[in-house]
């Protein structure tokens, strides 16, 4: 279905008349590789919770990351055992390995090793990396050798999303002694959001959304939010059952067979508005109805002393004329001059 008839154009006002946020601001002072605070305003009442909660859930559940999914330690057949000359038992080593932050360039399976002799600590930087895989917390402790050792282990690293239990990481081709481990692939550590009142002109019942995002460093908070928004957009697009052939707008064309709406050239004084609304238009230097209809609701609400009551009044009067706020009139100055010239010749 294509939006190219008056009924669908009217329906389009369901979303085009809603106020849209000015943009997203990021707190530069507190922002790091791992944390950022985003602010988005103004939003329609209730949209702060709707958008904030949706982004939070997608951020926590649906972004891809890399994590260790299996480990094989020489001398250990299962996780409930110990390794000679190693302070930690196998269970503790596995817990430490799960906290290593990997970053993968491509979504595939990586196999890496650690071969270390003691005495001394074994860090994430001791992992013998392969092309396309990096470690973002190289100083993370994996184990401690209290004697000469050695400690030899092989790690399997995969790319995925969300939490995957150890049972699902087990494959039939795993060598004997390989221990599948549960993996948390998500690069997101924590997400918080708050909603406060926002002001547009004299109206204070809009929403201001503040979103805080913590990551493990494999993706920046800004990119993480962008990915989450893209996921939501892709999932919601299937619900739109029509296409817009072009941006729905009011094309003002002056011709003999299709005369322009004469109301556009009337003075706003003829609208017989309340004193408050009329004064607001006067303060905004709006003298003609054609100038008024080209203003959006957001523009009008930014006008001093202009509130929801005045907005409702103007919208109702314009609707009775077949007009509305937010119209686009091509070449308005030229059309106005042509109309004045025609009136002078009449």
UniProtKB/Swiss-Prot annotation:
Catalytic activities: RNA(n) + a ribonucleoside 5'-triphosphate = RNA(n+1) + diphosphate
EC number: 2.7.7.6
Group of enzyme by EC: transferase
Record Gene3D superfamilies: 5' to 3' exonuclease, C-terminal subdomain, DNA-directed RNA polymerase, insert domain, RNA polymerase, RBP11-like subunit
NCBIfam families assigned to the protein according to its UniProt record, in alphabetical order: PRK05182.1-2, PRK05182.2-5, rpoA
Written domain comment of the UniProt record: The N-terminal domain is essential for RNAP assembly and basal transcription, whereas the C-terminal domain is involved in interaction with transcriptional regulators and with upstream promoter elements.
Protein name stated in the entry: DNA-directed RNA polymerase subunit alpha
Organism of derivation: Sorangium cellulosum (strain So ce56)
UniProt gene name: rpoA
């Amino acid at each position: 279905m294509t939006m190219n008839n008056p009924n669908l154009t009217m329906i389009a006002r369901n979303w085009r008349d809603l106020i849209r946020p000015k943009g997203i601001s990021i707190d530069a002072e507190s922002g790091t590789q791992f944390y950022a605070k985003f602010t988005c305003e103004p939003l329609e009442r209730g949209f702060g919770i709707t958008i904030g909660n949706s982004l939070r859930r997608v951020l926590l559940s649906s972004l891809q990351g890399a994590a260790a999914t299996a480990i094989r330690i020489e001398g250990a057949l299962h996780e409930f055992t110990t390794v000679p000359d190693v302070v930690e038992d196998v269970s503790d080593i596995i817990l430490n390995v799960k906290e290593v932050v990997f970053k993968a360039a491509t979504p595939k399976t990586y196999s890496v090793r650690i071969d270390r002799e003691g005495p001394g600590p074994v860090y994430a930087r001791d992992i013998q990396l392969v092309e396309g895989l990096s470690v973002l917390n190289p100083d993370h402790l994996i184990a401690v050798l209290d004697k000469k050792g050695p400690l030899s282990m092989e790690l399997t690293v995969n790319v995925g999303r969300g939490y995957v239990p150890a049972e699902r990481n087990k494959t039939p081709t795993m060598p004997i002694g390989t221990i599948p481990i549960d993996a948390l692939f998500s690069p997101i550590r924590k997400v918080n959001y708050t909603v406060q009142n926002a002001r547009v002109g004299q109206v204070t019942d809009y929403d201001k959304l503040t979103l805080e995002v913590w990551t493990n460093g494999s993706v920046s908070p800004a990119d993480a939010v962008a990915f989450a928004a893209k996921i939501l957009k892709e999932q919601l697009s299937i619900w739109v059952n029509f296409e817009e052939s072009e941006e729905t707008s009011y094309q003002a064309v002056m011709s003999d067979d299709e005369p322009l709406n004469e109301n556009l050239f009337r003075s706003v004084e003829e609208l017989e508005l309340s004193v408050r609304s009329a004064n607001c238009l006067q303060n905004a230097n709006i003298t003609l109805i054609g100038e008024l209809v080209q203003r959006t609701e957001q523009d009008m609400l930014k006008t001093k002393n202009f509130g929801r009551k005045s907005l409702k009044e103007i919208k109702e009067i314009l609707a009775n004329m077949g007009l509305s706020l937010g119209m686009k009139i091509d070449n308005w100055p030229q059309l106005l001059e042509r109309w004045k010239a025609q009136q002078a010749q009449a």
